[in-house]
From Swiss-Prot:
Taxonomic lineage: Eukaryota, Metazoa, Chordata, Craniata, Vertebrata
Binding positions (ATP): L33, G34, E35, G36, S37, Y38, G39, S40, V41, K56
Binding positions for Mg(2+) per the UniProt entry: N151, D164
Keywords: Acetylation, Apoptosis, ATP-binding, Coiled coil, Cytoplasm, Cytoskeleton, Kinase, Magnesium, Metal-binding, Nucleotide-binding, Nucleus, Phosphoprotein, Serine/threonine-protein kinase, Transferase, Ubl conjugation
Intracellular or extracellular location(s): Cytoplasm; Nucleus; Cytoplasm, Cytoskeleton, Microtubule organizing center, Centrosome
Gene3D superfamilies linked to this entry: 1.10.287.4270, p53-like tetramerisation domain, Transferase(Phosphotransferase) domain 1
Catalytic residues (positions): D146
Reactions it catalyzes: L-seryl-[protein] + ATP = O-phospho-L-seryl-[protein] + ADP + H(+); L-threonyl-[protein] + ATP = O-phospho-L-threonyl-[protein] + ADP + H(+)
Protein name: Serine/threonine-protein kinase 3
Tissue specificity field: Expressed at high levels in adult kidney, skeletal and placenta tissues and at very low levels in adult heart, lung and brain tissues.
Regulation: Inhibited by the C-terminal non-catalytic region. Activated by caspase-cleavage. Full activation also requires homodimerization and autophosphorylation of Thr-180, which are inhibited by the proto-oncogene product RAF1. Activated by RASSF1 which acts by preventing its dephosphorylation. When autophosphorylated at Thr-180, recruits STRIPAK complex and promotes PP2A-mediated dephosphorylation and inactivation of STK3.
Record PTM N-acetylmethionine, positions in chain: M1
Length: 491
């Protein structure tokens, strides 16, 4: 693969002159890197400086308000630990957002490409840069709201940078607390799920989950339905490693300090930078070998894919003659970066399997559309609903609603998805908010068995209530959007 020329000068911001030209006059687009929030991401070269950049191309029918918010947040940031923003263009029906290029891809990409989880030294080094990025954002009164391995990018030197601000938010004096569910369910803080308002330390919980993800290859609860996960995260004790004995006391304590359920008692980014696990982190040079290995694997797979495409073109005539016996499997055979759904018990080795995790496949950002069978990146958005910014797991609520309606059509006696009285569970059966379960010791065996038997229907009822609350909030927005579209069509 031909290497880009060395940069003539470091690009800091696009000049006014550059911004008045067509983007093709300013950049040479080289290749597609993957899918980001709202659009496709491409690798390109800035002709004047020779610098490699990333360009996100966003269709204008996407939610422009959300895109403008993302650009606004990026534009205000000037930190070596946050992906830089250079400028934007409108080209035909697309908005081009020019950003800093991180050649090694996301931490999630690297884990999948190498089929290996990370060791403690690598995790500590990545976390140190990530915490510096969070410290900067939080000082600027910004919440990222979607911290995970898929949104931590590495450049070829090993410097980690925060990316994908599609759901980030600005804290203001008039809106110091948020009460909307935004993010990806497995990484979400309990207070975010409970919609009781949250602030910057919600990112710290997500960082703790990301630490486990880097160590074990997936976040806690990844093997269960996301709807169940959002019930379990606020009610269960904070998650920890599946095999705590494999990890040092410092690392275990760091994760424990991130995963404190009470946000008022949770450590801040500044405090965590003083934690022994982070203070003893090694320099970024220790990441170079794993980055080189991942990039070599990626290049090899790209070459294999190109070779297979060429072979398919050569054999296309034969395929047409014998179309009933030919089955194309190019995507499957190339083995592009797929999210893994299960982990082997072997030390630090991740094995790829077919999806056993419904449709989430740990997809970072949003679940794929139904017609996509393979995931080729770590930053996917649902192609069927680009207009509305909403958490990924809410797709399951829509499916549950559809399923309930199907039951109504099949059986007129099944009108309620959960046929139970609201008062079937006494108030004292509710899970304590402080997570103190000592009271269970005083219950009889029969009471414990009854409580255990009641948990599933209780959970299903609470999930249904959450779905109904979300639908009640979402429908007026959709109605207003439809009304605006109809008015625009009348012009």
């Amino acid at each position: 693969m031909e290497q880009p020329p060395a940069p003539k000068s470091k690009l800091k911001k696009l000049s006014e002159d550059s911004l008045t030209k067509q983007p093709e006059e300013v950049f040479d687009v080289l290749e597609k890197l993957g899918e980001g929030s709202y659009g496709s991401v491409f690798k390109a070269i800035h002709k004047e400086s020779g610098q490699v950049v990333a360009i996100k191309q966003v269709p204008v029918e996407s939610d422009l308000q959300e895109i403008i918010k993302e650009i606004s947040i990026m534009q205000q940031c000037d930190s070596p630990y946050v992906v830089k923003y250079y400028g934007s263009y409108f080209k035909n029906t697309d908005l081009w957002i020019v950003m800093e290029y991180c050649g090694a891809g996301s931490v999630s990409d690297i884990i999948r490409l190498r089929n290996k989880t990370l060791i403690e030294d690598e995790i500590a080094t990545i976390l140190k840069s990530t915490l510096k990025g969070l410290e900067y954002l939080h000082f600027m009164r910004k919440i990222h709201r979607d911290i995970k391995a898929g949104n931590i990018l590495l450049n070829t030197e090993g410097h980690a940078k925060l990316a994908d601000f599609g759901v980030a938010g600005q804290l203001t004096d008039t809106m110091a607390k948020r009460n909307t569910v935004i993010g990806t369910p497995f990484w979400m803080a309990p207070e975010v799920i409970q919609e009781i308002g949250y602030n910057c330390v919600a990112d710290i919980w997500s960082l703790g989950i990301t630490s486990i993800e880097m160590a074990e290859g997936k976040p806690p609860y990844a093997d269960i339905h996301p709807m169940r996960a959002i019930f379990m995260i606020p009610t269960n004790p904070p998650p920890t490693f599946r095999k705590p004995e494999l990890w040092s006391d410092d690392f275990t304590d760091f994760v424990k300090k991130c995963l404190v359920k009470n946000p008022e008692q949770r450590a801040t980014a500044t405090q965590l930078l003083q934690h022994p696990f982070i203070k003893n982190a090694k320099p970024v040079s220790i990441l170079r070998d794993l980055i080189t290995e991942a990039m070599e694997i990626k290049a090899k797979r790209h070459e294999e894919q190109q070779r297979e495409l060429e072979e398919e073109e050569e054999n296309s005539d034969e395929d047409e003659l014998d179309s009933h016996t030919m089955v194309k499997t190019s995507v499957e055979s190339v083995g592009t970066m797929r999210a893994t759904s299960t982990m082997s018990e072997g030390a630090q080795t991740m094995i790829e399997h077919n999806s056993t995790m419904l449709e989430s496949d740990l997809g970072t950002m949003v679940i794929n559309s139904e017609d996509e069978e393979e995931e080729d990146g770590t930053m996917k958005r649902n192609a069927t609903s680009p207009q509305v910014q909403r958490p990924s797991f809410m797709d399951y609520f829509d499916k549950q609603d559809f399923k309930n309606k199907s039951h109504e059509n099949c059986n007129q006696n099944m009108h309620e998805p959960f046929p139970m009285s609201k008062n079937v569970f006494p108030d004292n059966w509710k899970v304590p908010q402080d997570g103190d379960f000592d009271f269970l010791k005083n219950l009889s065996l029969e009471e414990l068995q009854m409580r255990l038997k009641a948990l599933d229907p209780m959970m299903e009822r609470e999930i249904e209530e959450l779905r109904q609350r979300y639908t009640a909030k979402r429908q007026p927005i959709l109605d207003a959007m439809d009304a605006k579209k109809r008015r625009q069509q009348n012009f």
